[in-house]
Every structure is written in C-alpha cells, then in structure tokens.
Regions:
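Proline/serine/threonine-rich low-complexity linkers at boundaries of modular beta-sandwich domains
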Residues: 22-28
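Bacterial signal peptide processing site
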Residues: 18-20
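Contiguous segments within soluble domain cores/interaction surfaces
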Residues: 46, 53-83
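C-terminal motif of bacterial Sec signal peptides marking the signal peptidase cleavage site
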Residues: 14-16
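Extracellular/periplasmic metallocenter environments
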Residues: 30-31, 35, 40-44, 50-61, ...
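Long luminal/extracellular ectodomains of secretory-pathway precursor proteins
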Residues: 72-73, 88, 93-94
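Bacterial N-terminal signal peptides that target proteins for export
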Residues: 1-6
Length: 141
C-alpha cells in the first residue's frame, strides 16, 4: 500500500511540475530620436516587450490602453490642450505599465498580459529644446 501512495504522490508531483501551455509573445522595440520602431500589430496575450534605446538621448516608454474607440489622434488632441498638464489622464486612457529612463544602448524588458484592444506607447521625456519627445513624434499606436 505504501508503494501505491508513493507512486501516486510522485505522479502528482510530476504533473504539478509540468510545463505551462500558455505562450508568451516576445516583441522587439527600439527607441530612437524620436520614434518607436516596432511591428504594426502585436498579438494579445502574455507579451514581453524588449526595449532597446538605440538613440543618443534618454528614452522611456509608458504603455497605455485606449478605451471607448479612441485612437492615437485622440491622445494628440488631449495632450495639445494646455489644461491636460494639470489633470490626471482621461478615463479612456489606462496606463498599464512602463519602463524607466534608459541611456543610449541600454535595454529593458516588460511582460504584460495584453487584452485585445488599442494601445499606445509614449515617451514623456523632454528633448534638449524643451519640447516633449511626444511632440517630436515619439508616440506610437
């Protein structure tokens, strides 16, 4: 009887150690002056965003999900309003995650479960001329 219990316990342990069937997408992103270089679309599900700053300036990114049928054009209109700087983001912008500021040549990765929908990447840092990287085009849907 004890051999049967030992065999059952071993089988249970092996089953618990089995591989995870969920797939994680790996997506390479590059940040340069002043653009994100990335695929046009990214599959939903668990995704690792592998970011490399290929530029000479500091770069970062914030990942936001857009709700209510909004697009990157709506984000531009919102950010163009001077009042937007003194308010929290609108309810249709859900900041999901981000990576910290990286110097040229540095890399960082971020893993998130991306639900189907529209997302935008933004770099909120300021350029040497005092305008934001977003104003220079570092925003991507």
């Amino acid at each position: 009887m004890s051999k049967l219990i030992l065999l059952a316990a071993t089988m249970l342990l092996l089953a618990a150690c089995g591989g995870n069937d969920s797939k994680t997408n790996a997506v390479e992103l590059r940040g340069d002056e002043y653009a994100f270089v990335m695929p046009e679309t990214i599959e939903s599900g668990w995704t690792t965003l592998e970011f490399t700053n290929t530029g000479g300036e500091l770069h970062e990114f914030a990942l936001a999900k857009l709700g209510g049928g909004r697009t990157v054009a709506d984000v531009h209109r919102y950010l163009a309003d001077p009042k937007s700087q003194q308010q929290p983001p609108p309810s249709w912008v859900q900041i999901r995650a981000g990576i910290p500021t990286l110097e040229g040549g540095e890399e960082a990765a971020l893993t998130q479960e991306l639900e189907p929908g529209r997302y935008v990447l933004l770099c909120f840092l300021d350029a040497p001329d005092g305008t934001s990287h977003i104003e220079h085009g570092m925003i991507r849907e």
